[in-house]
Regions:
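Beta-strand segments within the central parallel beta-sheet cores of soluble alpha/beta enzyme folds
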Residues: 55-56, 152-160, 186, 247, ...
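Metal-dependent amide/peptide-bond hydrolase catalytic core
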Residues: 1-4, 65, 190, 195-197, ...
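Hydrophobic/aromatic beta-strand patches that form the interior of the parallel beta-sheet core
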Residues: 54, 86-88, 158, 184-186, ...
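Acidic/His- and Gly-rich active-site-bordering loop/insert found
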Residues: 2-124, 143-151
Length: 412
């Protein structure tokens, strides 16, 4: 059975590479998040593989609340018999390409690199690659079943479109609507580690309000920018203490704090009356998000209080919970670990990552979940969220084989 699955992946790998290239060629930047056209293209491609696709358009009000334009989640189900339901989740939305590319971001060019053929394009590693990984893993199981292999259970593909803005209208929406109730889940990842935990993330928008005045008479105003510089200095000073809080999870170090956006002011010759900035606070799995947010709000208020006449308003933009292992995750991890060792020739460890992902939405429902898919050892190797994002095609083939064999184990 192992041979038949591996043989199917090998024999159909040109089709799989072409399938991935066609997905990469259709932009799905988020922001702005107009992702329904990509879902339509993915539907046609999946149907071309003989798979039945359920499109689930997300209502426009929910899409707008997520800061997007359109989103259609796709579900593919194949029932082999009575048994567990295993969901495979990957996201098709991508961050905008930005500058500095040597290759066309939506060209899906393949280059013969020293380590073998490599495909370039936005989303090729995060995570349109796992649309291909999971679809062809399912096809490999279907082919094995036609040859007489008995499987018990159901495989579902959850192909969603809002991971880059939080996942609330992707996996979370599918689960809340009762469209799916899986027993296990595997979410998009890379090939050389099985991720079982990740950081949480809190985004806060802070508005600092003062009073405008003529720049020739600054004392008649209340300078919001001067206050903001002090507040930012206080935040940056707290980084040293955060660096001392070390997680016990392998692959995760300490909490971090970053200010990524700032805007404000009226004109060069006016005392600024309003500054808005957004901060990103990454939380290790051991932290309690509600406590982290409360402490930040107290810290911001105390820093602002040093500036008479300044008002501060704090709004939560995003709260992504940390991923902690759910009971039963080890069953998935062990099913992946053995074929990974056989295919890759190395032991694939379980680890944590400092990112946050859609996997947390499954864990929040008590569903055992790990991250595993096609990709290199690190995000840096893939240039994820960077120019010339890339994927070694050998990693795509390996991951497809490994996931298919893991599914065969879980459904046996």
């Amino acid at each position: 059975m192992t041979g038949s699955i591996s043989d199917f992946v090998a024999q159909n790998f040109d089709r799989e590479s072409t399938f991935l290239a066609e997905l990469v060629k259709v932009p799905s930047d988020n922001p702005p998040g107009d992702c329904a056209p990509h879902a339509a293209a993915a539907t046609r491609l999946l149907q071309g593989l003989g798979l039945t696709v359920e499109p689930h358009p997300v209502p426009s009000d929910a899409v707008a609340a997520a800061g997007m334009v359109s989103a259609t989640n796709l579900v593919v189900r194949h029932r082999f018999g009575d048994g567990p339901v295993i969901a495979l989740n990957a996201h098709g939305d991508v961050v905008p390409p930005g500058l500095g590319w040597r290759h066309e971001p939506y060209g899906a060019a393949v280059e013969d690199a020293p380590h073998g053929p490599t495909m370039f394009g936005r989303g090729v590693a995060v995570s349109k690659s796992d649309f291909a990984t999971y679809a062809f893993a399912l096809l490999a199981l279907k082919a094995a079943a036609t040859e007489g292999r008995a499987f018990r259970g159901t495989v579902e593909l959850h192909l969603t479109y809002d991971e880059e803005t939080g996942g609330d209208v992707g996996p979370r929406w599918l689960l809340e609507q009762g469209i799916t109730r899986p027993d296990f889940a595997i979410a998009a990842g890379f090939s050389y580690a099985i991720v079982t935990a990740h950081n949480g993330c809190l985004h806060l928008e802070v508005t600092v309000t003062g009073k405008q005045a003529h720049a020739a008479m600054p004392a008649t105003g209340i300078d919001a920018l001067a206050a903001t510089t002090g507040i930012l200095a206080d935040l940056y000073a707290s980084r040293a203490a955060l660096a001392q809080r070390l997680s016990k999870v392998e692959g995760i170090s300490s909490p971090t704090l970053n200010v990524g956006l700032i805007a404000g002011g009226i004109n060069t010759n006016v005392v600024p009356d309003r500054i808005v900035f957004r901060l990103d606070r990454r939380m290790i799995p051991e932290e309690i998000p509600a406590d982290v947010e409360a402490a930040l709000r107290v810290q911001l208020a105390a820093a602002a209080a040093k500036y008479p006449g300044i008002r501060i308003d704090v709004r939560r933009v995003l709260l992504a919970m940390p991923l902690v292992p759910q009971p039963g995750f080890d069953r998935i991890a062990s099913a992946i670990r053995k074929p990974a060792r056989d295919v890759l020739g190395v032991d694939v460890p379980t680890t944590g990552v400092p990112l946050y992902t859609d996997a947390r939405h499954y864990a929040a429902r008590g569903i055992p979940v790990v991250l595993y898919g096609a990709g290199p050892r690190t995000l840096l190797e893939a240039n994820a969220h960077n120019a010339d994002e890339n994927l070694r095609l050998s990693d795509l083939r390996a991951a497809t084989t490994i996931v298919a064999l893991a599914l065969a184990d879980l459904l046996s």
